[in-house]
Amino acid sequence: MSEEQELDLNGEMLARREKLAKIRAMGNPFPNRFRRDAYAYALQAEYAEMAGDALKDADVQVKVVGRIMLKRVMGKASFFTIQDVSGQIQLYVARDNLAEGVYVDNVGLWDLGDIVGVCGTLFKTKTGELTVRCADVELLTKSLRPLPNKHQGLVDQEMRYRQRYLDLIANEQSRRTFVIRSQVVSGIRQFFLERGFMEVETPMLQVIPGGAAAKPFVTHHNALDVDMYLRIAPELYLKRLVVGGFERVFELNRNFRNEGVSVRHNPEFTMIEYYQAYADYHDLMDNTEQLLRKLALDILGTTAVPYGEYQFDFGQPFERITMHDAIVKYGNGIAREDLDDIEKAVEIAKKLGIEVQKSWGLGAVVNAIFEEVAEHQLIQPTFLMAHPAEISPLARRNDENPEVTDRFELFIGGREIGNGFSELNDAEDQAARFDAQVAAKDAGDDEAMFKDDDFVVALEHGLPPTAGEGLGIDRLVMIFANAPSIRDVILFPAMRHK
């Protein structure tokens, strides 16, 4: 903000405080009770197309509230546009329609951003705009700071994220985005409840962070004198519940990962994670297709979902392709047999500019090659399958090829949206894979998993054949809201301290 802009702001704030002082002298400037009986959108939907004479004959009395977004003062009368949670409606406030002195002493002190309540009758102006002719008015909240420029809106991206309340006031698209977010969350919850899943809650603070390859946030519990971690995933606790006999469970909640911030990553994010006994990863891919198709129809009314330059088709069966096949398809001449040889795979990776870590085995190298040559090519909804066992420490090995797992990742628009697999329920194999993760961590991989002996003990009691999946809510909302950044779909995203 320039020095001149700051002086203008200070001057306007001073003027508003002077108005507030006058209002205080007349009574309470922040009354606590006004009972509306109508919302702007509902009034527009029912009466906007009604002829003026018919509307006059109907004599529709309303009580509405809202924030003043536009103001036109014309001597003894004024027009205001107010905005409530549903939309906007115009007010006509005339001195002669109000009690004596109210127009000058009350309405004359209103500013953009103030919140008012009015009672009146609906009518049409000469231009045909639905309007409330006000017979009684009340200031409910005095705004001491001005709104963003009414013509430009709130265009500064950083301010939109830091002061989300202003963004929501000024930008209809932002309000729409978070309505869509609410619909996505409630739609997912309803989808699983209708299919017999039980919603559960598992610890956010964990002594051993598990369930994903990620770097955790560390904290300390003073009373127990023990380091604890904000969870990176609820997976191991949810599978304990399946061991305990709850055959269908899900949790829709927050996870935390102490990693970078980007248009796709926020350190605090929301996921749905669910587990289904006596199902395999093919069943979960079917579930996912059904879920996304239903969300698209319920929220957008179509299975053709626009996103930037793309249009995703949720109406057709999603493509299913193995990691090796994807590399061969998009790898510009990479031979399948070279992906089965560690030396040749490393050579390919280095030619692609990949920095190969000493701790990587063949599976990790192949995964890095996939991320470099194929991941961004998976635009239409695609299930990537047959991940190397090395990078899938919790997934069941494939019966025909134990070097890969019965795992899938869902990609849309070149971005990972979900991850699922048939669960590893062999306790001895799980213990060995945890040991391999510990070795990788000791070798410098700070995203390798911790060993969770208690989880191995749970598996030793018997986990039935089970499949599980996690879906990123934020990235799903990005798709349905056509939002380019994850910050656009999180109400209060992580920001550098100002």
Curated annotation (Swiss-Prot):
Superkingdom of source: Bacteria
UniProt KW keywords: Aminoacyl-tRNA synthetase, ATP-binding, Cytoplasm, Ligase, Magnesium, Metal-binding, Nucleotide-binding, Protein biosynthesis
Main location: cytoplasm
Catalyzed reaction equations: tRNA(Lys) + L-lysine + ATP = L-lysyl-tRNA(Lys) + AMP + diphosphate
InterPro entries cross-referenced by the UniProt entry: Aa-tRNA-synt_II, aa-tRNA-synth_II, aa-tRNA-synth_II/BPL/LPL, Lys-tRNA-ligase_II, Lys-tRNA-ligase_II_bac/euk, Lys-tRNA-ligase_II_N, Lys-tRNA-synth_II_C, NA-bd_OB-fold
CDD domains for this protein: LysRS_core (cd00775), LysRS_N (cd04322)
Record text on cofactor binding: Binds 3 Mg(2+) ions per subunit.
Record's subcellular location: Cytoplasm
Gene Ontology molecular function: any one: lysine-tRNA ligase activity
EC number(s) given by UniProt: 6.1.1.6
Cofactor requirements of the protein: Mg(2+)
Binding site for Mg(2+) 1: E409, E416
Keyword Magnesium applies: yes
Keyword Membrane recorded: no
Cellular component, GO annotation: cytosol
Biological process (GO), any one: lysyl-tRNA aminoacylation
Positions annotated to bind Mg(2+) 2: E416
Entry-linked NCBIfam families: lysS_bact, PRK00484.1
Quaternary structure (record): Homodimer.
Family under the similarity heading: Belongs to the class-II aminoacyl-tRNA synthetase family.
Protein name per UniProt: Lysine--tRNA ligase
Species annotation: Haemophilus ducreyi (strain 35000HP / ATCC 700724)
Classification of source organism: Bacteria, Pseudomonadati, Pseudomonadota, Gammaproteobacteria, Pasteurellales
UniProt gene name: lysS
